[in-house]
């Protein structure tokens, strides 16, 4: 699942539309997931009033937040809620839309670290990376519980999984962490930098 429902306030424009490799980031991420062998792909598209996303291929569902104004955690819940009835004992691989360095090889390393009933979250220098992680679909009810209590931290959701055994850690090397370089402001976006000139 691709998390693409954010408001991109720091960027000043919708990150799903930013171009990488001559295509919007959203379509790039779809291609990476398909190349990694994933067949059931959805996009967490945020609230109903979110501006339009780049057109996606037919059959890619756009999932809407069921909990208002609770950030990425609402997208995590939407994805798990979509996947759980289809694959109750499976997993949901979640990636943020604004990870232009993400690769098939990196995703395959992540996928290799899951186990029955247990997902995997990368960690780098002590900080979890929950927006490029795999969650067991059985955690859907826990995601609902967090949001019903207005707990919007995906970090806290992951920590609960680590404490109770349904998540594991992948300690990233410096090289592996480069795949999680993201674009948060115009200064992070190479095209924007080129337009600014030297």
Question: Where are the language model's segments positioned?
Answer:
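Nucleotide and nucleotide-moiety/phosphate-recognizing core
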Residues: 1-179, 187-197
